[in-house]
């Protein structure tokens, strides 16, 4: 599975709306100052976190059950910064909306800027023909509160091309997260 280059990413973003909104270059500074980088890199695309967050809390004594998820386990926040409690996690989403081609599998890796602070970003692969905003899971592995920034880079997407097209894509099998918008909670 060869990895796709910046040229391919730009071409697909422009002709097939692979990523929207799309930043064709790497951005490290905006009019308001330095930011954690986002946009196109040599062999990937650094996504931004939107300003919508769901902060995990245990104030409602919920049990985390992926087959019967209780949304009361989260507090909603709309802000430019989110503080993750110690040893806890937050859900967010990308600014960017993705449309993955049928012959592509997309892998997401966290940025080292956050990893070096004990903040881990987890995203499952974006499967062939999946589309939507990517729900981001941020884990604070430290004993201190940790900060994440909206509208700045948080993770990198790598696009891998298969040697042949799959028989059944995510769209074909009616994947439950197809077309998701906003921060999406677990669906059984």
Curated annotation (Swiss-Prot):
Signal peptide: none annotated. CDD domains: trimeric_dUTPase (cd07557). Pathway: Pyrimidine metabolism; dUMP biosynthesis; dUMP from dCTP (dUTP route): step 1/2. GO terms for molecular function: dCTP deaminase activity; nucleotide binding. Keywords: Hydrolase, Nucleotide metabolism, Nucleotide-binding. Its EC number is 3.5.4.13. It catalyses: dCTP + H2O + H(+) = dUTP + NH4(+). GO terms for biological process: dUMP biosynthetic process; dUTP biosynthetic process; nucleobase-containing small molecule interconversion. The keyword Metal-binding does not apply. Transmembrane segments: none annotated. It is an enzyme of class 3 (hydrolase). The active site is at 137 (proton donor/acceptor). Homotrimer. Belongs to the dCTP deaminase family. Catalyzes the deamination of dCTP to dUTP. This is dCTP deaminase. It comes from Coxiella burnetii (strain RSA 493 / Nine Mile phase I).
């Amino acid at each position: 599975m060869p990895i796709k280059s910046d040229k391919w990413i730009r071409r697909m973003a422009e002709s097939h709306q692979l990523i929207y909104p799309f930043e064709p270059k790497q951005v490290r500074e905006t009019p308001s100052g330095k930011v954690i980088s986002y946009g196109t890199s040599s062999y990937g695309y650094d996504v931004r976190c939107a300003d919508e967050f769901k902060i995990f809390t245990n104030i409602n004594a919920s049990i985390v059950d992926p087959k019967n998820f209780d949304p009361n386990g989260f507090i909603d926040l709309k802000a430019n910064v989110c503080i993750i409690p110690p040893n806890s996690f937050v859900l967010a989403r990308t600014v960017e909306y993705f449309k993955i081609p049928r012959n592509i599998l997309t892998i997401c890796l966290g940025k080292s800027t956050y990893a070096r602070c004990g903040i881990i970003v987890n995203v499952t692969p974006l499967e062939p023909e999946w589309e939507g905003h990517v729900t981001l899971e941020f884990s604070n592995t430290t004993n201190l509160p940790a900060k994440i920034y909206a509208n700045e880079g948080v993770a990198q997407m790598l696009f891998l091309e298969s040697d042949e097209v799959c028989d059944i894509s995510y769209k074909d099998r009616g994947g439950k997260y197809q077309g998701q918008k906003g921060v999406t909670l677990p669906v059984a």
